[in-house]
């Protein structure tokens, strides 16, 4: 019986993680199609991460006033409207659409990470695996639709618009899982809790800031730096990791960029699903390893020391493994080490870290990618300006 509950918990949170992150991934995969080859891909990353970062930054001060039941319709509406606007392919409609999808992704991550406090490690494993699955499903499905099946970009994007309705499965949790005494019930109004939410309301903003400051060194800095380095690679360097098209298995240069994204997401999925089986306490290890990956890719982009795309594809896959491992180990450490009365607050608050690192990478990438591309053109490698 308990095994069945664990399986259901994992399955539900796997789906929540998948749907919450899939539009974010699809939008990044479509970056070259949304803005074309002449503009930095980090512009899309900036619009895809800034709203998510802002809502995560402000959430500790207001999220306790919104019941979980009321959050789900908000997530669905934002996601569906966002991807519909993005599918228009008009830059001035795409960018607001990306903002709406980003708000949904950030608010969804806070919501479901906080819910793992009630459901335990199986829910966190399911969530982490699902978010990793969103990477591979999102990037691979977009690659399949646009590169293999050659569907037009607008139709390909519209096909994702119905997926947020899967969030409605949340309302089945009470019947299929929470009714068991193994789990804490979520039936009571969230603002009547005697736990961390009530503490938030009574202690005020100053106390919240003090509690947040205790999370910076053990959790926030290592997770932020991992995401900083990997998204500098993905959006700032990877668009310039190109080779003569006739030496690759691809038809267009944009196919190389989309394939890099798929390989990265495959690595993320594998490590987010099974990374908890190799627990790592010192999260700074992942920061160092990801920094090494960034330096290697920068040197390839600038000096072109290998003419084999295979080595770069392997490196991008490995980069995904490191990123996914960092994420799952960070939140697993929180579940194991943080006092239960603080855990819900900590899980929601630390989620800002990945967005912070990604946001900084977006700003840096706007400068980095054009600089690398300019250098490549000057040395006889004009591929970064080709489609």
From Swiss-Prot:
<protein>
    <recommendedName>
        <fullName>Protein BTN1</fullName>
    </recommendedName>
</protein>
<feature type="transmembrane region" description="Helical">
    <location>
        <begin position="93"/>
        <end position="113"/>
    </location>
</feature>
<feature type="signal peptide">
    <location>
        <begin position="1"/>
        <end position="31"/>
    </location>
</feature>
<feature type="transmembrane region" description="Helical">
    <location>
        <begin position="72"/>
        <end position="92"/>
    </location>
</feature>
<feature type="transmembrane region" description="Helical">
    <location>
        <begin position="225"/>
        <end position="245"/>
    </location>
</feature>
<comment type="function">
    <text>Involved in vacuolar transport and vacuole pH homeostasis. Also required for cytokinesis.</text>
</comment>
<comment type="similarity">
    <text>Belongs to the battenin family.</text>
</comment>
<feature type="transmembrane region" description="Helical">
    <location>
        <begin position="278"/>
        <end position="298"/>
    </location>
</feature>
<dbReference type="InterPro" id="IPR018460">
    <property type="entry name" value="Battenin_disease_Cln3_subgr"/>
</dbReference>
<dbReference type="GO" id="GO:0051453">
    <property type="term" value="P:regulation of intracellular pH"/>
</dbReference>
<keyword id="KW-0926">Vacuole</keyword>
<feature type="transmembrane region" description="Helical">
    <location>
        <begin position="257"/>
        <end position="276"/>
    </location>
</feature>
<dbReference type="Pfam" id="PF02487">
    <property type="entry name" value="CLN3"/>
</dbReference>
<keyword id="KW-0732">Signal</keyword>
<feature type="transmembrane region" description="Helical">
    <location>
        <begin position="129"/>
        <end position="149"/>
    </location>
</feature>
<keyword id="KW-0029">Amino-acid transport</keyword>
<feature type="transmembrane region" description="Helical">
    <location>
        <begin position="43"/>
        <end position="63"/>
    </location>
</feature>
<dbReference type="GO" id="GO:0005774">
    <property type="term" value="C:vacuolar membrane"/>
</dbReference>
<dbReference type="GO" id="GO:0006865">
    <property type="term" value="P:amino acid transport"/>
</dbReference>
<dbReference type="InterPro" id="IPR003492">
    <property type="entry name" value="Battenin_disease_Cln3"/>
</dbReference>
<keyword id="KW-0813">Transport</keyword>
<keyword id="KW-0472">Membrane</keyword>
<feature type="transmembrane region" description="Helical">
    <location>
        <begin position="151"/>
        <end position="171"/>
    </location>
</feature>
<dbReference type="InterPro" id="IPR036259">
    <property type="entry name" value="MFS_trans_sf"/>
</dbReference>
<feature type="transmembrane region" description="Helical">
    <location>
        <begin position="347"/>
        <end position="367"/>
    </location>
</feature>
<keyword id="KW-1133">Transmembrane helix</keyword>
<feature type="transmembrane region" description="Helical">
    <location>
        <begin position="308"/>
        <end position="328"/>
    </location>
</feature>
<keyword id="KW-0812">Transmembrane</keyword>
């Amino acid at each position: 019986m308990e095994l069945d509950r664990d399986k259901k918990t994992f399955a539900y949170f796997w789906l929540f993680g998948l749907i919450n992150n899939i539009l974010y991934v699809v939008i990044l995969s479509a970056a070259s199609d949304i803005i074309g080859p002449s503009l930095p891909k980090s512009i899309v990353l900036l619009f895809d991460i800034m709203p998510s970062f802002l809502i995560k930054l402000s959430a500790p001060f207001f999220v306790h006033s919104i019941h979980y039941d009321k959050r789900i319709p908000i997530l669905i509406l934002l996601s569906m409207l966002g991807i519909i606007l993005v599918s228009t392919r008009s830059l001035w409609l795409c960018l607001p659409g990306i903002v709406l999808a980003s708000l949904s992704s950030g608010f969804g991550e806070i919501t479901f990470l906080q819910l793992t406090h009630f459901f335990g490690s199986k829910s966190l494993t399911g969530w982490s695996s699902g978010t990793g699955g969103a990477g591979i499903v999102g990037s691979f499905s977009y690659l399949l639709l646009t590169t293999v099946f050659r569907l037009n970009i607008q139709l390909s994007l519209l096909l994702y618009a119905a997926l947020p309705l899967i969030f409605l499965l949340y309302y089945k949790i009470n019947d299929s899982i929470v009714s068991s005494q193994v789990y804490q019930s979520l039936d009571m109004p969230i603002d009547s809790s005697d736990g961390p939410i009530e503490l938030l309301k009574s202690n005020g903003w100053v106390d919240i800031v003090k509690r947040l400051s205790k999370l910076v060194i053990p959790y926030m800095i290592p997770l932020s730096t991992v995401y900083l380095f990997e998204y500098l690679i993905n959006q700032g360097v990877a668009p310039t990791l190109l080779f003569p098209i006739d030496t690759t298995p691809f038809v267009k240069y944009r196919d190389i960029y989309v394939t890099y994204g798929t390989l990265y997401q495959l690595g993320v999925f594998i490590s987010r699903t099974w990374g908890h089986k190799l627990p790592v306490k010192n999260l700074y290890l992942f920061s160092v390893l990801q920094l090494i990956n960034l330096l290697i890719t920068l040197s390839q982009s600038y000096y072109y020391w290998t003419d084999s795309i295979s080595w770069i594809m392997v490196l991008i896959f490995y980069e995904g493994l490191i990123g996914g491992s960092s994420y799952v180990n960070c939140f697993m450490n929180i579940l194991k080490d943080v006092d239960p009365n603080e855990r819900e607050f900590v899980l929601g608050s630390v989620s800002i870290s990945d967005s912070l690192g990604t946001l900084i990478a977006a700003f840096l990438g706007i400068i980095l990618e054009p600089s690398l591309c300019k250098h490549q053109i000057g040395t006889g490698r004009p591929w970064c300006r080709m489609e």
